[in-house]
Structure formats: C-alpha cells, structure tokens
C-alpha cells in the first residue's frame, strides 16, 4: 500500500500583474497578504512544491521518473496535471522545444531504461485519445470517433476500437504524438490564446519477458498513462459563448466528477459511499489509477495572480484530498505453466534451505521424492508431446496420400474427357462420309483434332486449410470478440443507487493462476482423430462413387470402340470393292480384245484378195488396235499393283496412241493409190479416229474418277486405323488406372484401419497416463500439505524447546544464586 504522490507547481506571474502572493518554502506553499504576512488557514504541505523558477526537467526528475522506471519493471503508472485554465498544465505535460515536457521525457527515458536491461526483451504499443464533450476520439486515426468504454475480466477497463501502434524507438513515438496533436481540439478564450478544449490520454503498453529462457518465465504487462487535463474555467473570466461555452460545460462537469471521486477515495472512514467512476468517461478510464493497481502522481498547477486566488485554493484543496488516497501497486504478470512450475521449484528449494541444519531427514527424503515425481511429470509431458507430433505427422502423410488420389482422379477425368472428344470426332467423321454423292469431302476441316478441354478437379476433394494464424492487430479488440464484456450503459443502469464498501471496490483480488487440467486438453485429441477418420471414410466413399462413374464411362468407351470396329469393317469392305474396279476394267479390255479379234477374223474372211490395199489397211489397223489394247491391259495391271502414280500413267498412253495414229496414217498413204479407195479409206479412218478419241476421253475420265476414289479410300482407311489405335490405347490405360485405383483404395483402407487402431491404443495410453498424472499431482499436493504441517509442528516444537531451554536456564541461574548465597 502506498499513497498517491502529489506535487504543486506555481507558474511564473504575468509581467503586468506584479509579484506572486504565494510563497514556496521547501515542500510547503502558503498564501501571504500584500504586506507579506502569511495567512495561517492557507498553508499546505505536499510531496513536492515547485516555484516559478522550476523547469520541466526538475519536475520530471523528482516526481515522474520513478513511476516511469517502475512501469518498465511491470507496474502500472499514471501521471496527470490538474488545475484551472491557463495555469500551465499543457506546458508541464508537453513542454517546448527548449524544455520538453513530461510526456516527451518519459518516452525517451523508457527506451533508455530498456536499453540498460539486457536480460529481457520488450514490446511497446502506444495509443493517443482525447475526451471532447464526453466523447472519446482517436487522435491517431481520425475515422475512429465516439469510441465506447468496456470492461473485461482479464483486461479490465479498455476503450474498444482504439488504434494501437507498435513502436521500436522514441523518435517514432514522438512523430505519432505530433500527428495526434494536430487532431486535438484547441480554442481561444480571454484567459488563454491556445486553450485545450479536451482531455488527452497518451497510453503506453509495455510487455516484457526474459531472454534466457522465455518459455519458462512470466510475461510482464504494464500500462503507462500520461494525461493532460483541460482546465476548469469560469464563464465570467473566459467570456466563452456558443461552442466554447458548451465545451466549458463538459470540461467543468468531468472535473467536478473527478473531484467527487477524489473526495470519496480520501474519506478515511470504513463505510464509504459509492464511488462514481462511471459518471464520467475520464474517471472511468482512470479508475485503475485512482485507488487501484497503479503508481500515480498528480501535478496540480496554480496561477500566482491575485484574481486567481479562489481557483488556486480549490486546486490546493483537491491536491490535499488526493494526497490521502492509497493504491496497491503490484507487478502485472501473466504466468504460464512453465513459469508456475519454475516458481514451485524455487519454493521447494526455499523449504529445503529452511530445513537444513535440523533433524528432518524424512522431510528431505519426501522433498527428493517430490522432485523425482516432478521430473517424471516433465518426462511424461515430453513423451505426450512427441506422440502428438507423431500423430500430426501421420495425419499429414494421410492428407498427402489423399492429394495423390485426387491427382489420379484428375488424370482419369482428363482421359474420359479426351475419349468423349474422340467419340464426337468419330461421329462427325461418319456424318461427313454420308454426303449426297456418296464421297468424302476431303476439304472438310471438322475432323481435324483440336486441343481437348480438360475438366476441372472436383471441389469435393479439396481440403480446406484453417488459418489459425492472426498477426498482431493495430487496434484493441472490439466488444463482439469478448464474450464476458458489459457495455457502459448497462453498468450505469446496474450501479444507480447502489452503495458498496470501498474495500470491496477499490482493490481487485489477485487471480490465482491455476494450471489447466491436462485431461481436458488431451481427451479432445481422440475426438479430433475420430473426426479425421470419419472424414477419411467419407472421402473414400467419394472415391468409390467416382470409381463407379469411371467404370460406367469405361463401358461407354468400350461400346464406342465396338461401333468404331464395325465402321472399320464396312470401310474395309468398301476398300476391297474399289480395289476390284481395275480388275473388272482389265477383264473388260480383255473381252473387248477377244471380240475385236473375232471381228478382224470375220473381216479377213470376207476379203478375197489378200494383197489388196484394203487387206493391208485392215492388217495395219489390227496391229495398232491390238497394241493399244495391250497397252491398256498393262496400265490397269500397273494401277492394281500400285507401282505408278496417276501422272505417270497418262502421258505414256497418249504418246503411244499418237505414235499408233501416225503409223496408221502413213500406212494408209502408202497403200491407197487410187482416189476412190483413198476417199473410202479416209472416211472410214476419220470415223474410226473420232470413235477412238471418244473412247480415249471416256477412259481417261473414268480413270481419273477411279484414282480420286482410290486416294480418298486410302485416306479414310489411315484415319480409321489411327482412331482405332488411339481407342485401344485409351482402353488399355483406363483398365490399368481402374486396377491401380482399386489397389490404392484397398491399401488406403488398410492404412486407415491401422491408423484407427493406433489412435485407439494411443488414446487409451493417454487416458491411463493422465490418470496416473492426476494421481501423482494429488499425491504431491498431499505431500506438500504434510510438509507444511510438519514445518508448523517443527516450528512449534522448536519454540517450546527454546522456551523450555530458557526456563531451565533461568532455574539454573536461580539455583546458582541460591547456592552462592547459602553459607
């Protein structure tokens, strides 16, 4: 328990007002008359009193520095300036470039102190707010206006939505302060050109922990509040009106409530009335600093002029009442299980040191047993952690296996999509074959394979990751994130008319840090593993359904392959039919040749004179025609054998025909001597030549059609062969993949069953271990209680032994004196 440190500072008087009526002597301030005679009723003593010549540096060194150092060590701290308007509060807290105020000096001193502490690491967060017309505004984030005050069981009183900046050096904080000062409300009155129209609170949250063994040490969290209050004012003096008048009303109201709170807290009687913290936003925020867990200092500033005497007296009365308030400041620590275990070890060592030198071997043995049990407990914890990590690793392997199954299913989907594409391609090809002329359109590009459109992976196999990680927020948590938070209006309704004892309200009981039972944490592990096994079973069911659908698609693909095979057989039959056309033409030419020979024989039999020109002409024509028919047979045989192309067949036939025609013409010219025979021969020759030309053209056109049809059929046959080969490969791949999926499914089922069995065994082992651990912990507590009882009994016996020894000694002395007196 310690009292609030209170100091009074007198600002220098204005040049036109003359000397000050307040006299400062050591730590006492008194009011003197104009003749320099003191007024006995106007004298006050405080922890520190600073006269007109004091500087901000001296105020900080004597008043605030110890609180700043305590805040670095883990204590809550608060410093604020109180007084009337124009008395120097803002100058004391903010200062100037040549003489920085308490806020800037505190910021620099905090970081200097941190650099001197090498065995701990620190994290500092700052926020800057103002209370303007009973509304809380964030000076670091202009958009955060009209913030609300809430209370949490662990955090205590806090402002929801207030922005907090994590800082690393003093310069960064000073820049934030300068940016916040720009957003603060100032105004001009008759008493002050630059008057503060709002209360400002600059807050630093300092967290620290040890560097050597951070996992086994407690975390210290302290809050440092540096408050610059707006000054109380009288309307008659300030001449305020309009907005300034409204601001002055809210300022005077909050300061009046602050005075009431100080008055209630300074009452020394046991039965104190209800303390109205909730009547004002200012007192609600400063509740821990006023009669709570904090080291607090108040700087009361007064004006030395004669016309401000009444306001100065009121300020001194406020300071006198505040001086009687006591706080119970303690280090704020967050204890982990490791830190609690470390402290228990230290307590055991202290008990061991106390028992040294006494006859307590049994107790020493018990302490040793407790230490061994504690060691076993630590080893058991490590073993459980190792098993948990092993289970997590196995779970990760199962997830990887499931992902591999997903990839394989994606590949099967791609194969099925490719097969569907090929089936559509085959259907388009069959339709394109059935043109009105019965021929294929070779210029049609619809059968050209394109890039297949693969299906996207099924979303049912995608495992959603839980992002449990959340970085450090820039703002305090909002009220909806805290389940046990009551808002300000609810607290106001609950506390109206309520009268409570200050001893019950003033102090916050220390919450004991009890270790969380491990059974609660560990019994959730089998449930979680069971849910994971159920999830795996559902995924296996999905894989089975997908496999069935793939089997159906595979059957469809087999049916499509059979249809393609039937189409291929029809195409082969048509190809054989086309290949038989040259044979038929060759047979027709042979028949024509035989008929022609019969006609020639008949004509020769009709000619009696074999030496006549007609006989000679008939003989030459017979030779030429026979040669022509033989040439046609040779060309057809070449076409059937596929030894020549179309271009190599046309030119030899036409050249040979031209040669035969020239030979026929020469023969007729030599053989025909008379004009009548010549005319008859020419007429018959011209008719035969025209007939032969027509036959030649007809044969050429038929030959061209046959070649085109043959080439088209060859192309169709090649394309059908390619489609058939692709279908066979796809069919074989699908069969292999289905077989592989069945094997993978069976292996996955075996793995899941094995994992389930292992999880059950591990869960049973964990339950047994936890039961043993609880038994050991209970036994350890019982032993500690026995040690305490034995220590108390030992101390009692020791006291009785000492008293008995002193009594015997006194009796011995009496006997000695009696013996010496006896003659």
Curated annotation (Swiss-Prot):
ATP-binding recorded as keyword: yes
Recorded GO CC terms: microtubule
Keywords: ATP-binding, Coiled coil, Microtubule, Motor protein, Nucleotide-binding
GO molecular function: ATP binding; microtubule binding; microtubule motor activity
GO BP terms, alphabetized: microtubule-based movement
Coiled coil (UniProt feature): 341-414, 527-557, 696-786
Pfam families attached to this UniProt entry: Kinesin
Residues noted as binding ATP in the record, renumbered to the chain: 83-90
Matches recorded under InterPro entries: Kinesin-like_fam, Kinesin_motor_CS, Kinesin_motor_dom, Kinesin_motor_dom_sf, P-loop_NTPase
Sequence ranges assigned to domain Kinesin motor in this UniProt record: 3-325
UniProt key word NAD: no
Assigned protein family: Belongs to the TRAFAC class myosin-kinesin ATPase superfamily. Kinesin family. KIN-7 subfamily.
Listed name of the protein: Kinesin-like protein KIN-7N
Organism: Arabidopsis thaliana
Lineage summary: Eukaryota, Viridiplantae, Streptophyta, Embryophyta, Tracheophyta
